[in-house]
Amino acid sequence: MSVFHDEVEIEDFEFDEEKDVYHYPCPCGDRFEIPREMLEMGEDVAQCPSCSLLIRVIYDPEDFVKLETISTSKPIAEPV
């Protein structure tokens, strides 16, 4: 069981589009981070790369559902 420094809503994070990572300030001076891919997988723990602190990210997993496209081997026939 992890001990969290805090619980923070995803809306309070900053999103780095270039790195596809959410950031939130850490008391040590660095930033907690969690990649969008981890949120899509249901992960809710952001770590600081400089210290041992963890925070729990509060978010709606449905907002991060990765939509998959399904390809069909047959072309779809148009109605005549």
Curated annotation (Swiss-Prot):
Residues reported to bind Fe cation: 26, 28, 48, 51
Residue ranges annotated for the DPH-type MB domain, each copy included: 4-60
Pathway, per record: Protein modification; peptidyl-diphthamide biosynthesis
Transmembrane segments: none
A GO molecular-function descriptor: ferrous iron binding
Domain notes: The DPH-type metal-binding (MB) domain can also bind zinc. However, iron is the physiological binding partner as zinc binding impairs the protein electron donor function.
Quaternary structure note: Component of the 2-(3-amino-3-carboxypropyl)histidine synthase complex composed of dph-1, dph-2, dph-3 and a NADH-dependent reductase.
Descriptive protein name: Diphthamide biosynthesis protein 3
Native source organism of the sequence: Caenorhabditis elegans
